[in-house]
């Protein structure tokens, strides 16, 4: 049973009438451009064919009723005429409430709705299940009430909800790619202007995501430390962000910087350049160059930004040994565990999977999870 069939059936069962509208919003994976977003730099994600689906209908009053199919059909209900407060015990509810609250501030011209939500974006794998939910909820009200908000505004609304209502300090990439993704394309995003450029993916290439299933522990504290080190670097150059520093400027005075800060800055500057070049390589179908850039990105995250772990490095090594120069592989996400992303010719996917299954657990004691994805369409009707 598809997610849409599941939410549609549950809607009729719980609310006693059929849903009128079905909305999906995808998760995402970032192909290259790591820790560049908060430095006003570039990222190159694609939406994936794992998504949040919502079956919904307008109500005649100002109440919002929600059923979460993936949480034992837990329910939430709140009014648009009363202050929307955080839910004490249901964290999933706060993503819905936060999006609706911030949507009201943008465009108060909408009424109540009934929603049934389900998703298959793996949680805790760094594939943006939360952004997918936020964008899906925003898109529900945009469609039901014909709100004059575009995809970028729906994305910004989701980011605001996560930062200010849920209390998680995320960048804009995850929501933007979920809202604006394009089938068979990646999206080059300028995190300063929020400008986007669709980049065609080569035919016959699979997006493979492998979760190391290594339990991340340092990610929060170390993430904040990396941000502070980048800000220190930007201040040294008297710039608003590292986006504004050239590699030549850096190389001329790198010896004057604290050695650790210098390594962090070098990663961001080289990663920005790699990301822009990667978009060009992908558009030209040059998988060999894309693979080189992904390898350089991984080495930079390992040696200069120091955010990889041995389990992740092992996965990258195993995949690279199979694909050689026919594709690329690197860690993706914040670091200290999580996933690797690989661009793999479809014919080689079984061989990659077999190699990972044979070697990863034997070398690390952890069983991986393997996903084969297609670059998919952003949020909309389904």
UniProtKB/Swiss-Prot annotation:
Reactions listed under catalytic activity: alpha-D-galactose + ATP = alpha-D-galactose 1-phosphate + ADP + H(+)
Keywords: ATP-binding, Carbohydrate metabolism, Cytoplasm, Galactose metabolism, Kinase, Magnesium, Metal-binding, Nucleotide-binding, Transferase
Keyword Mitochondrion in record: no
Enzyme class name: transferase
Entry annotated with the keyword Manganese: no
Location within or outside the cell: Cytoplasm
GO biological process, any: galactose metabolic process
Entry binding sites for substrate: 34-37, 223
Xref: InterPro entries: Galactokinase (IPR000705), Galactokinase_bac (IPR022963), Galactokinase_CS (IPR019741), GalKase_N (IPR019539), GHMP_kinase_C_dom (IPR013750), GHMP_kinase_C_sf (IPR036554), GHMP_kinase_N_dom (IPR006204), GHMP_knse_ATP-bd_CS (IPR006203)
Pathway: Carbohydrate metabolism; galactose metabolism
Residues that, per the record, bind Mg(2+): 130, 162
PANTHER family: GALACTOKINASE-RELATED, MEVALONATE KINASE/GALACTOKINASE
Entry function: Catalyzes the transfer of the gamma-phosphate of ATP to D-galactose to form alpha-D-galactose-1-phosphate (Gal-1-P).
Name of the protein described by the UniProt record: Galactokinase
Source species of the chain: Cronobacter sakazakii (strain ATCC BAA-894) (Enterobacter sakazakii)
Organismal lineage: Bacteria, Pseudomonadati, Pseudomonadota, Gammaproteobacteria, Enterobacterales
UniProt gene name: galK
